[in-house]
UniProtKB/Swiss-Prot annotation:
Name of protein: KIN17-like protein
GO biological process: cellular response to copper ion starvation; regulation of developmental growth
Region listing for Disordered, in residue ranges: 182-211, 232-286
Intracellular or extracellular location(s): Nucleus speckle
Organism per entry: Arabidopsis thaliana (Mouse-ear cress)
Length: 411
C-alpha cells in the first residue's frame, strides 16, 4: 500500500482530485466543504463545526436560501454578460462553464431544484429571453447596462422633442384658424355697416324725390307762424297727399324686402364661415391622423389581455396584465395581475382592455395618440367609444367616435 507522503504518487493523485470537480451531492454549502466520498461526507455531517452551521441555518432558513439563490443568479448572469452577451446559447453550455469554478454556489443550496426551473425563472423575470426547442433550452441575455440605458434615454429625448414639435405645429395651426375666423367675422361686420349706410342714403334720396313731386304737382304747403293757424286741405289736396302716403308705404315695403335679402345674405355668409372653419378642422384632424397613426400601439402603464394560445398551457390565456416596459415598439414586458409573473409578449398576441364608463384610458393610436382621456360612452353596434381628453394641449376636447383598438385602460 502506498504511503501518503508529499511527493508519493498517492499524494499527487489526491491533490489532482482535489483540484478538479467532485460530486455535487457530497458538497456542504453551509461549510463550503467538498467531500470526496459518501463516508467523508457522513463524517463531516457529524462534526461539531457542521452542527454549529446547521443551528445558524435553523434560525432563519428562508433568508439563507434566498441569499444563496440571489448569489447564484447574479453570478450566472455575470457569466452570461461577459461570455455570451449578444448570442443565443444552450443553457447547459452556460451552466457547465459556470460550475467550472469549484467555489461556485451550488444549485442544491438554492430555491431551484433543477436547471429547467432556474431557466424558467429567468424568462419570467425578464432577465433572459428563453426558448424551448427539441435540443433543449436556449437563452439570450437581455442587456440592461449603462450603454443600453443611455441609448434608451437618447431615444426617449428624441421622442419627446418630436412630440413637442408636433404640439408647436398644432398650436400654430390653431392660431391660424382663429385668425382666419376673426378676419371673416371682421369682414362680415364691415359689410353690415356699409349696408346700413346705403339704406340711410336711399331714404334721403326718397325724401328729396317726394319734396320735388309735391312742388311740381302744386300741392300747397302751410307754414305755422305765431298763432299756429291751421290750414284746411281741400279734397283734391287730400287725394294727392293720400297718394303720396301710399307711395311711401310701397317704398317701405321695398326697403323691408331689401333688408330681408341682406339678412339672408349675412346668414349665408355665416354658414359659409362655419363651413370653412369645419373644413379647416377636418384638414387638421386628417393631418394629425396621418402623422400619429402607427403600426405599433404599446404604451407603458396600460392594461392588456394576453390572447396567445401558446401560453394557454401556462394559464396566461385571456389573463390581464400591466405593460411595464416596451421593447423595440412591438414587444411588451407584461406583469400579470393574478400571478405577478413577468412575460414578454408580442403586440400581435395582445388585446386592448376597456374600463367601465367614467374610467381613464390611454389613446394608443390615431390623431390624439399618447393622450389620456375619460371614457364617456360605448357604442356596441359600431364598435366605437366616446371619450373626453384630459390634460395636455387638447384638454376638454370630446372625440365622439373612436375605435376600441385605439384606446386602452390605464393601470
Amino acid at each position: 500500500m502506498g504511503k501518503n507522503d508529499f511527493l508519493t504518487p498517492k499524494a499527487i493523485a489526491n491533490r489532482i482530485k482535489a483540484k478538479g470537480l467532485q460530486k455535487l451531492r457530497w458538497y456542504c454549502q453551509m461549510c463550503q466543504k467538498q467531500c470526496r466520498d459518501e463516508n467523508g461526507f457522513k463524517c463531516h455531517c457529524m462534526s461539531e463545526s457542521h452542527q454549529r452551521q446547521m443551528q445558524v441555518f435553523g434560525q432563519n432558513p428562508t433568508r439563507v436560501v434566498d441569499g444563496y439563490s440571489e448569489e447564484f443568479e447574479q453570478t450566472f448572469l455575470d457569466l452570461m454578460r461577459r461570455s455570451h452577451r449578444f448570442s443565443r446559447i444552450a443553457a447547459t453550455v452556460v451552466y457547465n462553464e459556470y460550475i467550472n469554478d469549484r467555489h461556485h454556489v451550488h444549485m442544491n443550496s438554492t430555491e431551484w431544484a433543477t436547471l429547467t426551473e432556474f431557466i424558467k425563472h429567468l424568462g419570467k423575470t425578464g432577465k433572459c429571453k428563453v426558448e424551448e426547442t427539441p435540443k433543449g433550452w436556449f437563452i439570450t441575455y437581455i442587456d440592461r447596462d449603462s450603454e443600453t440605458l443611455f441609448k434608451e434615454r437618447l431615444k426617449n429625448k428624441r421622442v419627446k422633442s418630436d412630440l413637442a414639435e408636433e404640439e408647436k405645429q398644432e398650436r400654430e395651426i390653431q392660431r391660424q384658424i382663429e385668425r382666419a375666423a376673426e378676419k371673416l367675422n371682421g369682414g362680415g361686420g364691415e359689410g353690415e355697416t356699409s349696408g346700413n349706410d346705403e339704406v340711410v342714403d336711399d331714404g334721403d334720396d326718397e325724401r328729396k324725390k317726394d319734396e320735388d313731386l309735391r312742388l311740381k304737382s302744386g300741392v300747397k304747403v302751410g307754414f305755422a307762424l305765431g298763432g299756429g293757424v291751421k290750414q284746411v286741405a281741400t279734397g283734391k289736396e287730400r287725394g294727392e297727399s293720400s297718394k303720396l302716403l301710399f307711395g311711401d308705404e310701397e317704398n317701405d315695403k321695398v326697403e323691408r324686402g331689401e333688408k330681408r335679402k341682406r339678412s339672408g345674405d349675412s346668414g349665408r355668409s355665416e354658414k359659409e364661415r362655419r363651413s370653412a372653419l369645419d373644413e379647416l378642422m377636418k384638414e387638421e384632424e386628417k393631418k394629425k391622423e396621418r402623422m400619429n397613426r402607427k403600426d405599433y400601439w404599446l404604451f407603458e402603464g396600460i392594461i392588456v389581455k394576453v390572447m396567445s394560445k401558446a401560453l394557454a398551457e401556462k394559464g396566461y390565456y385571456k389573463q390581464k396584465g400591466v405593460v411595464k416596459k416596451v421593447i423595440d415598439n412591438y414587444v411588451g414586458e407584461i406583469k400579470m395581475l393574478d400571478s405577478k409573473h413577468v412575460l414578454r409578449v408580442d403586440q400581435k398576441e395582445l388585446e386592448t382592455v376597456l374600463p367601465q364608463i367614467g374610467g381613464m384610458v390611454k389613446i394608443v393610436n390615431g390623431a390624439y395618440r399618447g393622450s389620456n382621456a375619460r371614457l364617456l360612452g360605448v357604442d356596441t353596434e359600431k364598435f366605437c367609444a366616446k371619450v373626453q381628453i384630459e390634460k395636455g394641449v387638447y384638454d376638454g376636447r370630446v372625440i365622439k367616435s373612436i375605435e376600441y383598438e385605439d384606446i386602452c385602460k390605464l393601470a
